[in-house]
Amino acid sequence: TQESQKGNVGYKKVRTCRANRHPLQWCRKQRTEVLMMNQAKFVVDIEACVGCGKCVKVCPGGILRLNPSQKAEIADFKEFGWNGCWKCEHCLAVCPMGAISIFGHRPENSLPMVDCTIAAPAMDSLIANRRSCRRYKDKNVDTAVINDMLGRLSGAPNGGNKQQVEFTLIDDRVQMDHFRQIVYSRMEALAAQGIYPKGFSKEAYEDMKRWEKTVRPDMLFCGAPHILIPHAPFGHGEPIQDVVIAGTHFELLCASRGLGAVMLTFPLGALEQMPDIKAMLNIPAHHYIGMIIGFGYPEIQYARGVQREMEQDRIHRLAFEKAPI
C-alpha cells in the first residue's frame, strides 16, 4: 500500500478480477487498479488508462491531471463545488478505455451512447408530436414509471451542476382530487369577492370558466391526476433556469412514455391569493416556482404531429467583419 502524505488524497493498489473486477481471492485473473482515497471515490484502472488526457480536459473543476507516469489522478480538494469536484461524472463518461470509476459508479453500468442516425429522427418526432394535454383519464400512473422519470431528471442540465432543484409531487389521483377541490372552492369564493388569480382579470377568469365546458375539465389543473412542481432555492446556482430546464425535460420524458403533460402557471396565480393553502405544498418561501406540471394518461390520443414552421424573422444571425476590441 502506498499512501499520500497530503490531505484526503492517497493511493491504494487493489487486485481485482480482470473479467468482473471482483477481489483477487475470488478469481485468478488479476488486474491492478489505483484507488484515489478521496471524497469522490475516484478510481483509475492503471492498466487500462492510456494517458490520453481527455478526462483532464473535460473536468470543469480542473482537479484532474496526469501524473509522471501519464496516468489520470485527482488533486486534493476540500469540498464539492466550484473549486473541487462538481459531481458531473464527465471523467467517467469521456474515458475511451473505461478506465475511470467515480462515486462507486463503474463505466460498464452506464447507458450506451446513442446512434445519432436513430436518435435524431426520434427526437425530432418527439418534439413535433408532443402536445399540451388538457384532458386525462381518471387513472393513476404506475409509481415505478413516475419514479423512473424522476430519477432521469438527475441528468437535466443545471447551473454549476449544483443539483439544487427539488420536486414536490402528488402521485395519487385521490389526493390530487382532494387538493383540487380545496383550491377550487377558495378560488371561487375569492372570485365572488372580485379577487381573481394573480395576473388575471374578471374577463380572463370568465373565459377560463367557459372553456371548462369544452377544452379542460377544470381551469386549475386540467383534470390531471398528478402534478409535479420543480422548485429551487434562490442564492444557489441558477434557480430560474434550472427549474425551467427540469420541467421541460420532465415533459419530454412524459411524451416518450405515452403520457400527457401540461405546464401550468394559472394555478400559481390562484395560489398566490391563498397563502394558507399554498403552504400545504410545503415548499420553502425562498424557493423559485416557475410552473406546475399536470400529467397522466391522455384521454384523447393525437393522430399526427403539427406542421409548424420557424419564421425566419425570428432568427438573428450574427457576423463580424472584425473582432471586437
Question: What label would you give each PLM region?
Answer:
Residues Q2-S4, Q30-T32:
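Short, basic, low-complexity termini and linkers enriched in Ser/Thr/Gly/Pro
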Residues Y11-V14:
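Short linear segments in intrinsically disordered or otherwise low-structure-confidence regions
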Residues E33-I325:
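Acidic, surface-exposed loops and disordered segments
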